[in-house]
Amino acid sequence: MPEVWKIDFYIGDDGSLPVRAWLDTVPQDVRGKVLARIELLRTGGPTLDYPYTSQIEGKLREARLRVGKTRYRVLYFFDEDRTAILLHGFTKATAAVEESDKKIGRARMASHESRLAARTGQKTAPRTPAKENKRR
C-alpha cells in the first residue's frame, strides 16, 4: 500500500487560512483543478516532481498548474509531522516566482515551524542559506 501524506493549510497567527481565502478568489472551474493538483501531494509526497511541483529553495516548493495562459501556484513545504503545509497561493505573472511571493512563503514556513517546535518542545532546524539550495 503506498504511503499517504497529510495536507493542511497554514494557519495565520490571527486564525486566518490564507490559501483557502485565495482559493475563494480563483474562478470556480479552475479551483477544482488547483485542488486536484494539491491532492497529488497525498500520494506523491516530497518525491512528486516536475511538472506537478518544483523546488523554489530549500524545503520551499510550489505546486504548479497552468490553465490557458494563466499560471496558478501554491507554495508549500513538508513539516516534521510529514504534512504538506500549504503556505501561499497566487497567480504567477512572470517566468520566475516573484521575490515577494517567496518572502511570504518563507515567513509562513518559519512561523509554522516555530509553532510546531513550541508544541513539541523541539528546536527548529538551522536554516541553510538559500543560494546553496537553488537548482543547478
Show the residue positions of the predicted features.
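Basic, Lys/Arg-enriched alpha-helical interface segments
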Residues: M1-R71, E80-A84, T91-R136
